[in-house]
Amino acid sequence: MKAIKLFAIAALTLGMMACNKKEDSNVIPNEGTQATLSIKVDAGSQLRALGASPADGDVKSLEVYVYAGDLLEGYKKVENTSEAVDINVTTGERKLVVVANANLGKINSLTELQEIALRDKVVMVEPSGDDQVGVVMTAEPQTITIKAGKNTYGFGAGEGSISSAPLQLVKVPARISLVGASTSFEGAFAGWTFEPSEVFVFNVPNSSRLFGPSLELVEMGRYAGMKQDSWTGDLWVPSQVVKEVLRDEVSDLSSITPNNFIYYHSFESIGKPVVLVIRGKLKDDSGQLVKGAPFADDNGYTHYSILVNAERSGYAYTGDDTGTGNLKRNTDYRISVVIKRPGTSDPTTPPADAATLDVKVAVTPWLTVNQNIEY
């Protein structure tokens, strides 16, 4: 498993997004009384306590926007901190917007900011050259009232406090986490064995909105961890771009645990399921490699396809908004699998036999969805 995980998260579509390391300005002079605003955010996650949990709750960069109507009045960008202090503003009712890890730069119009989309870029959790870094997080626009003097948000109670609690950020993508996998071949397949070689995902959306009740874009592409021309099943979305970072080599299922899990990020997906696949080779009870359909391809590879958050026989869930086939922002889909039968030669055509796979999923905020599967 990779210690540093890449994931598909997107480039920003605005051409004017120059990013300076320190940006702080009164963009629109107003006639109201001069004031300052300091803000603290909370990007915490219940899952960050896990030993192998990725640093996808870290704030690499933080941008704070204050709008008077639709016009930008105050802006500040800070790095590697959850606090932005002494932003120059004026008194009155304002709209506060906070974005982490997106590096947007100054956006002079609130309407324009709310229409920004993320598109088509592979990004690292850790820095690499000029790549965008970290999971993008946002807070929907907040209406606040600025008073004369110092104003604070998230620094506790006291004079000038707009809110004592930090502003809550939510992650724009979802996370798909394989937290456990084992075999228990039974019936006619008792004594069979499975030797895993890799885990990958496909049908992963490559674009997303930043704001709004639904982040999915009508026009977007999809990514896959691998593809072979022989895969022709109904689950496959055409024209997917293969991204090696959506695949991990695995030689031992017991190495996958809740504290050492395999994970991928995906934007919101409505309608077409995102699929996680465990791929490897089957041997029968005499130790012979199984080749050929329906259980394996001509090279002896079988595939166990898991439709993330879908409703299927053998799938069990804990959490909210489960079994819909959709992926939602700021949600961790934690998948456990028990393999009981052979898989299929084509991962885009999952087996009809419900006894093939037991899947269990948990969903919480990060919302977590636990998905337990018997395959």
Cite the ranges covered by each PLM segment.
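Short structural boundary motif marking the start of a folded domain
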Residues: 31-37, 174, 274
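Extracellular beta-sheet/turn segments enriched in Thr/Pro/Gly and aliphatic residues
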Residues: 120-171, 307-375
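Beta-strand-rich domain onsets/edges
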Residues: 27-33, 162-167
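A short, amphipathic beta-strand motif
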Residues: 35-43, 176-183
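Bacterial signal peptide processing site
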Residues: 20-23
